[in-house]
Amino acid sequence: MEKITMKEKIDVQKPDDLGLDISDLRYFLVMLLFSAVVFFLLISQRLTNTFDGLWNNTWFFGGYWQVVTGRWLWPVIDALRFGIQTEPFNSLLTLSMSALAVTLLRKFFTEKDSVVTYLAGMAVLASTVTEIQLSYRFQSPVFGCSFLFSVLAAERVVRAADFRKAVVQGALLLVMSLACYQTSLDNFCLLLLTYLLLLLFRNVDREKVHAYIGRSLCSAAAGMVLYFLLTKLIVWACGWQMASYNGGADVSVLSILKNLPNAIAETYQLFGAYFFQNYYRHNILQPVGFFVLVFLALSIGLLNRFRKMLHRKNWEYILLGVAALIVLPIMCNAIMLITSEAV
């Protein structure tokens, strides 16, 4: 039997199939157990942040504020879990959804688990982002849902059988993600961009790359437009008005275009501040230049990939790859293009 190359693996992926098996269940359980151990102290001691995470009652239902800030799926999710927000139920529910999202996420980039895939998943789940979400105990499951929906949306764009299904399914899941928490748009955009880089590096057929770019752009545009229209409709049907929180009430096509140059510049500033400064404290290794070393290692790997592309003299893929790397900081902060107040 002929050996199947990495390029061919992409070509023969089954469409419309999540492809979950016993290895995925094992990975999910390991991720869930690991994250529960990491955050055991926070969960067992019922620790919360000093802002709106201080909730002592045992139940909570979202309502007016969640809807007028564009998070209209929040009350639905609260109702589905009967408003329960006691520990450890809420935190384990959140960690379960995050672990499932990471389980699906890794399948974008590999068909076989290794030490690297486990360490990568653990790094995502053990991040300060997860800790902050858990500290808002009454709303942490909504964060988990938003993360999971954003990964599922990107997964549908990649694996759906045809263009129409990819756009429709991806857009609907993106709407659900945004209706929980808008900043998950960043997850969706970054996943699609990194998968594009993977296709380019693996030298996948040009037609498939073009089709993938079309799927990605159309699903993202359709999802954001549909979310905007549904949000306006739901708020109007409730007899309310959009809140000015994070500039949400002023968002329009004109405002986005008008603020686009400043928003793009701010995405690069945030990217640099997050990884190369101590403004955002999220890793004890930051002061010793940990991320500089990580970026150097990644840069060596990327340069090697581009060297192979140069050897093939595939100038279109080289240009697409360079463009993807240039816009990567923008995709990491895509929500900033909508409203620059969403920091």
Label the model's feature ranges:
Residues 64-88, 92-97:
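Short hydrophobic/aromatic helix or loop-helix immediately within or flanking a transmembrane segment
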